[in-house]
Amino acid sequence: MRLCWLLLIVPISALAQIVPEDYTLVGVAVRTRPAYDGSESQVTDLIPVLRYYGKPWFARTTQGVLEGGARWALTPGLDAGVQLAYEEGRKTSESSLLQSLNLPNVDPGVSIGAHLEWDSNLGQVPVSLLGRVRQNIDPDRGAQADLRLNAGVYGSGRMIVAAYAQATWANSKSIESYYAINNADGGLLFTSIGLLGSYDFSRHWSAVAGVQCRWLHGDAASSPIVERTSSYYANAGIAYRF
């Protein structure tokens, strides 16, 4: 997956301070994704684009999942919060392998959890570090924990680009329910790197895009439904900014 690393290369001279703004973003994007992480089948769907930060309420898709809840400042640059998140399922109809194995769907669900987020600057580069735990409200679906680092890598006029790296851990129930295996050990589920970008083509309208490469680990990677251990996601859309 050498291409995945090349996606993170940007001109060093382009590094610029990106001053965060208090704004709301609402839109929609077209996404290409694997039928499930580990599938060779690639499918296309529509996803929301959302960024809203109030006091204390928030809703966003900018940290890897669709989530919303409340958050509070502990100290300048450090926030803690609780959230509900949409957890994607797995459709048998999207994969010929799942159909041949006659496996049932894994329905989408909702998780409840908490997070801690730190925002700062390293020199001219804005960075944020997110730690988050998510427990599915269906106890059989288990729990996951995320650690995500974001860094602004380009900011010039109307265009902003950020890079990120994420690691997600899962307990045994989460791995067993999604990857159709028994007696799984909990542990590192996947790691990923990606880019997010936006371009303002008017005062209120922005084009948004993202690309992500993801690698499975542990018992999930050796599941009988896993055809490949690497996957990619990409999306492009439009959003209204106010």
Where are these regions (language model features)?
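Outer-membrane beta-barrel transmembrane domain signature
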Residues: P56, W118-S120, R134-A221, I225-E227, ...
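Internal, conserved structured core segments that host functional sites
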Residues: S100-P139
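N-terminal signal peptide c-region/cleavage motif recognized by signal peptidases
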Residues: I9-A14
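Solvent-exposed loop/turn segments connecting transmembrane beta-strands
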Residues: A35-V43, A59-T62, L74-T75, V106-G109, ...
